[in-house]
């Protein structure tokens, strides 16, 4: 259950970020800010700050004295423990040094109202022992007098150095007043100096003005310190006990943002107003310095304008001169070009007339023309060099005026020699080009040579590539619809001349197969013969001469004995080859049914004649075993035919 607290109860108040702090519950005075519901106004000992806290954050002092009443390093905590025991009626109405320092920032009108309020609060508070009350009254009156003196002295001076705060001793209340007043017044030069700096543009003038103002402010601040040191000595002697206690509290005081003390609201306004009065001496110095600077600036600007006008005039004159010179050069070039054009026309006419003549005299004429051109170029060069010299002399005469003009002239000077050199080179090239051009006849001669050289550059096809190419040509030449016999014969002739190896033939077995088929091509006898010849050539190259002779003997015997069979087979093979040649699966349309019957009759007659001759010559061929072995075959075929 939360404890019911009353005004005047001593407690330990817990605030976030702080230890349990010795405090007292205050009574809400008339006209004061009312606390929110369920919260009590709290006065913190040691720091003399106030806040509103809920009862749950408050703990009775007597009950929790042993728990929370231990000394702590926090500033103001130990002082608070001492105050809650020895001076529980302490209040922010008895002003410590911090209050006087805050009041010193406020203008005179508000400070007098504040002092009246403090007197009323002291009258309303419970009475302290007589000695302490009398001492506090005396001290309050003395402090009010000191405040008025300070305002009178500090009115003319707006700047204070920070050395005064470090030189003062922190034991007396007067020293704390001076520290606070100095610290507040240190902000004034920071506000005033930017205004002066905005006016001053030159760096040298700025430094001088600032040095003078600082020296004036230092001398004034030292005088004020002496007066202030004399005045608080009497007040410190009259009340030693209270001044010592008051001087200790501001030293150990911590600024607590979460415990807002009752501070005067118009502090920033007071500082803003205080910054307004600027010392008359400084203002007069600054005004005079600004006037001087403005005069100096005006003079400087006038000089700059004059210099710029001069430069502009000089530059314009230079540009005019250069333009005139360029125009003259352009006119000279045009004249030279016109002369050269006339010469080139005459030369071209002469060259056209001399096309039929040998080229040797042409070379001599071109060499003479080139010599003339070189002479002309040499004559042009000294003219250009003289122009350059004239330009340099003019530029030197102008460059004596000012250093800044030299830079401009250098930029104008530099591109000129390079441009002139380029122009002369271009002239030489233009002069040489028409002389060195070849005639149309020479060009026509060179064209076929170039084409031949390009052809030579191409790689020669290998044997395998040529073989494949010829194979494809043969196939296309022997089409069923439109056979090209001549092309086929040429391709076969070329194929027979190729140095084919066994490896190439193993890779390209299709070539051998087509040759075998073409040997049985009935449409044209020449193609058959040529194919057989090429086939035998390739076979002889691969197998050798012995195998060739043996094959010839075997072929003769086979043709003698297997005549009818071979003819039938060749007929069938020819038909198959013609049907399947080049992927054409159409049968030959030339052969008719009647032709086939006639061929069969002719074959039967041939077979009968051969059989008769064989029976008559049987006795002669008994010694040859090859003939004996092949005798029964024709008999069997004859029986089949019958």
UniProtKB/Swiss-Prot annotation:
Q: Which residues form a coiled coil?
A: 294-342, 595-624
The highest taxon in the source lineage is Eukaryota
What are the annotated disulfide bridges? none
Q: Which SUPFAM superfamilies match?
A: HIV integrase-binding domain, Tudor/PWWP/MBT
The identity of this protein, by name, is Hepatoma-derived growth factor-related protein 2
Give the matching InterPro entries. Answer: HIVI-bd_sf, LEDGF_IBD, PWWP_dom, TFIIS/LEDGF_dom_sf
- Cross-referenced Pfam families: LEDGF, PWWP
- UniProt domain PWWP: residue ranges: 7-64
The Swiss-Prot or TrEMBL record describes its family as follows: Belongs to the HDGF family.
State its role.
May act as a regulator of myogenesis. Promotes the repair of DNA double-strand breaks (DSBs) through the homologous recombination pathway by facilitating the recruitment of the DNA endonuclease RBBP8 to the DSBs.
**Keywords, ordered alphabetically:** Coiled coil, Cytoplasm, DNA damage, DNA recombination, DNA repair, Myogenesis, Nucleus
MF terms in GO: histone H3K27me3 reader activity; histone H3K9me2/3 reader activity
Where does the record place Basic and acidic residues bias?
Answer: 107-117, 205-230, 289-352, 372-381, 416-449, 553-565, 607-621
* Organism listed in the record: Xenopus laevis
Biological process (GO) annotations held by this record are: chromatin remodeling; DNA recombination; DNA repair; muscle organ development; positive regulation of double-strand break repair via homologous recombination
Q: Name one GO cellular component term.
A: nucleus
- Protein's UniProt keywords contain Ubl conjugation: no
CDD domains under this entry? PWWP_HDGFL2 (cd20149)
Q: Low complexity bias located where?
A: 90-104, 231-248
For region Disordered, the annotated ranges are: 87-452, 542-642
Is Nucleus one of the keywords?
A: yes
Among SMART domains, the record links this protein to:
PWWP
Q: Per the annotation, which location comes first and is thus the protein's main one?
A: nucleus
Places the protein is found: Nucleus; Cytoplasm
């Amino acid at each position: 259950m939360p404890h019911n607290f009353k005004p005047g109860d001593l407690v330990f108040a817990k605030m976030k970020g702080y230890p349990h702090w010795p405090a007292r519950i205050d009574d809400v005075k008339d006209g004061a800010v009312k606390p929110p519901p369920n919260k009590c106004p709290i006065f913190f000992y040691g720091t003399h700050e106030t806040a509103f806290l809920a009862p749950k954050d408050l703990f009775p002092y007597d009950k929790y004295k042993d728990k929370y009443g231990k000394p702590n390093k926090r500033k103001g905590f130990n002082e608070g423990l001492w105050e809650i025991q020895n001076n529980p009626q302490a209040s922010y109405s008895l002003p410590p040094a911090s209050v006087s320092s805050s009041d010193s920032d406020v203008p005179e009108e508000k400070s007098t109202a504040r002092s009246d309020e403090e007197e009323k609060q002291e009258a309303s508070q419970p009475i302290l022992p007589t000695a302490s009350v009398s001492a506090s009254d005396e001290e309050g009156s003395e402090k009010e007098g000191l405040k008025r003196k300070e305002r009178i002295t500090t009115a003319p001076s707006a700047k204070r150095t920070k050395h005064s705060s470090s030189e003062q001793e922190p034991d007396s209340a007067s020293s704390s007043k001076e520290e606070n007043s100095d610290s507040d017044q240190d902000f004034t030069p920071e506000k005033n100096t930017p205004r002066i700096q905005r006016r001053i543009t030159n760096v040298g003038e700025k430094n001088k003005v600032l040095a003078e103002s600082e020296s004036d402010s230092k001398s004034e601040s030292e005088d004020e310190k002496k007066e202030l040191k004399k005045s608080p000595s009497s007040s410190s002697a009259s009340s030693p006990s209270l001044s010592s206690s008051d001087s200790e509290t501001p030293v150990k005081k911590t600024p607590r943002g979460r415990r807002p003390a009752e501070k005067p609201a118009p502090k920033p306004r007071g500082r803003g107003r205080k910054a307004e009065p600027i010392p008359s001496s400084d203002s007069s110095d600054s005004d005079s310095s600004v006037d001087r600077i403005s005069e100096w600036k005006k003079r400087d600007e006038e000089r700059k304008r004059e210099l710029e006008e001069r430069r502009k005039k000089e530059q314009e004159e230079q540009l005019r001169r250069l333009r005139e010179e360029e125009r003259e050069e352009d006119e000279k070039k045009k004249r030279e070009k016109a002369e050269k054009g006339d010469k080139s026309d005459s030369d071209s006419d002469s060259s056209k007339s001399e096309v039929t003549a040998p080229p040797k005299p042409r070379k001599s004429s071109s060499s003479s023309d080139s010599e003339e051109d070189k002479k002309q170029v040499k004559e042009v060069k000294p003219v250009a060099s003289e122009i350059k010299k004239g330009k340099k002399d003019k530029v030197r005469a102008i460059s004596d005026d000012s250093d800044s003009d030299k830079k401009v002239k250098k930029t104008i000077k530099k591109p000129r020699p390079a441009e002139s050199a380029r122009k002369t080179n271009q002239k030489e090239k233009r002069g040489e080009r028409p002389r060195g051009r070849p005639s149309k006849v020479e060009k026509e001669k060179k064209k076929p040579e170039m084409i031949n050289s390009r052809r030579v550059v191409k790689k020669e096809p290998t044997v395998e590539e040529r073989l494949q190419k010829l194979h494809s040509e043969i196939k296309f030449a022997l089409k069923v619809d439109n056979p090209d016999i001549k092309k086929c014969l040429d391709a076969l002739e070329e194929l027979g001349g190729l140095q084919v190896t066994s490896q190439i033939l193993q890779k390209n077995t299709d070539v051998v197969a087509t040759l075998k088929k073409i040997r049985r091509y009935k449409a044209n006898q020449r193609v058959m013969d040529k194919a057989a010849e090429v086939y035998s050539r390739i076979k002889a190259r691969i197998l050798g001469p012995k195998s060739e002779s043996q094959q010839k003997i075997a072929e003769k015997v086979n043709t003698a004995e297997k005549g009818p069979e071979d003819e039938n087979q060749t007929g069938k093979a020819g038909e198959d080859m013609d049907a399947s040649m080049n992927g054409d699966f159409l049968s030959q349309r030339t052969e008719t049914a009647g032709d086939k019957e006639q061929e069969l009759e002719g074959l039967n007659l041939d077979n009968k004649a051969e059989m008769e001759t064989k029976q008559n010559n049987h006795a002669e061929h008994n010694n040859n075993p090859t003939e004996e072995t092949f005798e029964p075959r024709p008999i069997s075929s004859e029986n089949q035919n019958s």
